[in-house]
């Protein structure tokens, strides 16, 4: 089994999620050295898979011989025809549709993103506020894509935030299966139920086969 995976992100929330999901498998999770000073990859893909794969390939060149995993994730709201989608990280940016492509890890404020979703869902009844979190992980080594892994979590978008444990859209995303928002989950619960946890389990299965 591959015992070490480097995660291409400077987002501490994502690193916590990965570490929590990997702990039961005995997999060491690390960040890329000096990642914060690395120029961001331009995310110009039309799908989560496109963006995750591109990031993994480019960032894996920074750590020769290592398995590097990058993710692209976001929220799809059915009443908004799948938005924010691949634009989730910067949905509140005023120039969202005026400047393409955009750079990874230059996210606008989470609260502003949430506020835009709430504004666009104003008046939408609860039964039509369905949506899902999507996470795609891409693994690469030495600039070559190895595989991708998709995880999803179905839920309901609330009309006000709840909880303080999460990041991004977590406070708005209500998960009926356990009666909590993702921002109310413990690290263990999030590893079990989240879209990122689902994708990571597929990654772990791939590691086991390797």
Set out the residue ranges of the language-model regions:
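Anionic-ligand binding patches
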Residues: 2-6, 12-210
């Amino acid at each position: 089994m591959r015992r070490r995976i480097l995660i291409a992100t400077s987002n501490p929330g994502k690193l916590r999620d990965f570490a929590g999901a990997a702990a039961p498998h005995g997999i060491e999770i690390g960040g890329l050295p000096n990642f914060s000073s690395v120029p961001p990859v331009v995310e110009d893909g039309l799908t989560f898979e496109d963006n995750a794969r591109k990031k993994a390939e480019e960032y894996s060149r920074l750590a020769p011989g290592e398995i590097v995993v990058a993710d692209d994730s976001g929220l799809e709201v059915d009443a908004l025809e799948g938005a924010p989608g691949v634009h989730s990280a910067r949905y509140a940016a005023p120039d969202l549709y005026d400047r393409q492509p955009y750079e990874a890890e230059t996210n606008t404020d989470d609260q502003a993103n949430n506020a835009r979703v709430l504004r666009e869902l104003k008046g939408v009844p609860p039964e039509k506020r369905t949506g899902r979190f999507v996470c795609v992980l891409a693994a690469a080594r030495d600039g070559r894509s190895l595989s991708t892994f998709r995880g999803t979590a179905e839920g309901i978008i609330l009309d006000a935030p709840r909880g303080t444990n999460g990041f991004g859209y977590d406070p708005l995303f209500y998960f009926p299966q356990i009666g909590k928002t993702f921002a109310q989950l413990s690290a263990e619960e999030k590893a079990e139920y989240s879209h990122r946890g689902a994708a990571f389990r597929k990654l772990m299965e791939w590691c086991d086969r390797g």
